[in-house]
Amino acid sequence: GQWPAGEVAAKVLTVEVADMPRDDGRRVQFAARAWDEQGQAFDLMLSDYQRRDWAVGSRWSVSARVRPVIGEVNVRGLNREIWALANGIDGMGTLGRDRKLVRQGGGFGLANMRDAVSRSWQRTGDKYPEFSDGIGLMRALSIGEQSALRPPLWQAFRPLGLTHLVSISGLHVTMVAVLFAWLIKRIFRYLPWIPAKPRVWILAGGVAGALFYALLAGFSVPTQRSVLMLAAFAWAWWRGSGGSGWTAWWQALAVVLLLDPLAVLGVGTWLSFGLVAALIWASSGRLKESGWRLAVRGQWAATVLSVVLLGYLFASLPLLSPLVNALAIPWFSWVLTPLALLGSVFPFELVQLVAAFLAEYTLRGLLWLAMVSPEFAVAAAPVPLLVLAMMAALLLLLPKGMGLKPWACLVLLGFVFYRPAKLEEGVARVTVMDAGQGLSVLIQTRNRNLLFDTGTEQVAQTGIVPSLNAMGVRRLDSLILSHHDIDHDGGFQSVAAVGTDKLLAGQPEFYPNAEFCQEDKWQWDGVDFELLRPSENAGKEDNDQSCVLRVVANGKALLITGDLGVKGEAGLIEKYGNALYSQVLVLGHHGSSTASSGSFLHTVSPQYAVASSGYANAYKHPTVAVQNRVRAHGITLLRTDLSGALVFALGQDDIFQGRLKKDKFYWQKKPFE
């Protein structure tokens, strides 16, 4: 069962490594079956920051700090609770130093087979380092080892809309099934006898090929669903009901949901079934058309439906995606993926070298293309407009369209170009993003947008940038990086891709074209902004180089101090005194005891204090001492680790607007209030 929601504790566990460990250079992470001292079993995702070896199938007695899967909650982005539930993950854990081997790994299990395949590719990569990225792509396409691809490659796939091609999904499994079915059909032509029911053998061969590939890829939940879907389609065709694509589609959907009800939580399920439905819808009554016409029509159907699905789910549309996918899908499906499988089943150096060569130059071409490929931010549309957009997309796919296709185009354009209503003059909307154990604050006026810090690279990619898009931020007027620390500027590259007119930093030497955030004042749309600097008596540590921003709208103020410590706070008090007074204070250093001194809280005298920290973080931020100091001053403490992103409206009577995302499903834990 799932790890209890409120329990975060150090435990002695017996763990068995269930899958290949992934090393991202910072930690080794792997899935494990774990048993506590009472014998209760859990499926955990464990992280080892000491980056030790963990053989697949080995069993260990370990000390670990285990917590439930609680992630960031923003208006858009990755929802870790949904991901964990859909993938059967009960909890997360960080391994301590103590471990004792209980049983060696090895054997002939599925995980061991995948580990052997990975090592064979790695040996070739070690021998030919000039093809290391190509080897990484082959490992990703054959056994689903996504960590083999460098982060810059993942960043290149996103603006091209190609992430689905390097994450083994329904597309890969389907193409392998088609390839196996085609091979069996070709083999039958050369047999002296033909089975009485060749269709059965062809369909069975396709499903068997899909199952083999899914097993090689680790038999993850998405690949399991893909095999189930294909098996259901094959069954429908064998029983004779495949003449109607819709009959097979409904039967496949029913089978998947009956065997795996949690499939409804997976974005991949909706994308897979949605795109297949679009293809069936677009080809209805046109099966006599030539192959290339059907292919073009299928690409058109997938593109139209993707406008709504990708715009809503990811708040972004890769503009070159239709063209790039039209070329990349056949290349990946019929060349690179078969070569990846061939090099895995027959791990000869020549086979793997040819595959790596083609993959390497494919990646180099995509990296170049990604530099010139734009993305279009799609703001979160109201539910009525979303429903109308989906109906418009389906209408465009109809053969005739009932004469309403021009109206459908207008609705889709309205969905894509929708923007939230502008703020009033003299009002600032402040969104303290849920950046985990990091910081990112968006400040919006009527016509301007300023972002203070970006959070970590992962949070920026999976939460901050999608949320900026969803809130209608197409470009930043200013980006402030308080200081050079991974939890404050780690997502700089990802956020910079959104575009910014001005970059300010406490340590500008670490960023291109950055200016030092010296003392300054300016006004946007009737809202005053002020950059503050502590007196010369402040500390010289990196944290004390943090930019300090104060925003005032209609007499209501916000103060952000980055990671400024007590020395820096004392320097601010010495220089500005009671001019620091603000209704909202973002606590320094995530609520660490090294900041938020009693004298500073007394001087600022905020109504609200916000701690931006990660749930159950190892530093125990906000610390008990800081919480006690805040409450002793009569200040309301708000926490992103418990509430998710928080919204304030400076310049209005009700400053605190509540959580950014107010609704949640009954099974979700966060927001906790």
Regions flagged by a language model, labelled:
Residues 1-14, 100, 184-197, 201, ...:
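Transmembrane helix-bundle segments that form internal channels/tunnels in multi-pass membrane proteins
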Residues 214-223, 238-242, 258-267, 311-319:
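Membrane-interface helix caps and helix-loop-helix hairpins in membrane proteins
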Residues 162-185, 474-497, 561, 585-599:
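Di-metal (Zn2+ and/or Mg2+/Mn2+) metal-binding site signature of metallo-dependent hydrolases
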Residues 86-227, 529, 557-562, 566, ...:
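Aromatic-rich juxtamembrane segments at the membrane interface
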Residues 569-645:
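Cap/insert and terminal regions of metallo-dependent hydrolase folds
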Residues 146, 235-238, 258, 262-264, ...:
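Core dinuclear metal-dependent hydrolase active-site scaffold
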